[in-house]
């Protein structure tokens, strides 16, 4: 988002939201301390939005995908385009860069709804990549947390299992969430 004029940043964020749903509306955005200097340190952006009708409604239940895992900024997540269906690799592989991806989302539930099931927790560590993630209910909110560390840009074939396990664990948090009344 920092490649354009600062006056266009909000429009760029709205464009990202509209890639998820044409009903999305940006309420507010906080770009953090020094967003223009994004190469000096990790950036943190916080934005609030609403999407009327985003959840699919059934009888006494709703189904939806976490926003941060539903086509939001996918163009910069090159690791999602690496085919992790392969069980083994005979040759090294590359990603665009090493990276630390931290995704946190808090979803306000309608009155009377609860997360179906017990939530989810997963982690994976290796010399190539680490992952930790959780999905839980906290009062009337569903809280999603993910931290994916891809430690290299150029990987050896022997790094494949660690990379694959971490990325697949990350992807698994993009499954639909069911809440019930």
Predicted features and spans:
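A sensor for short, sequence-defined functional sites
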Residues: 1-181
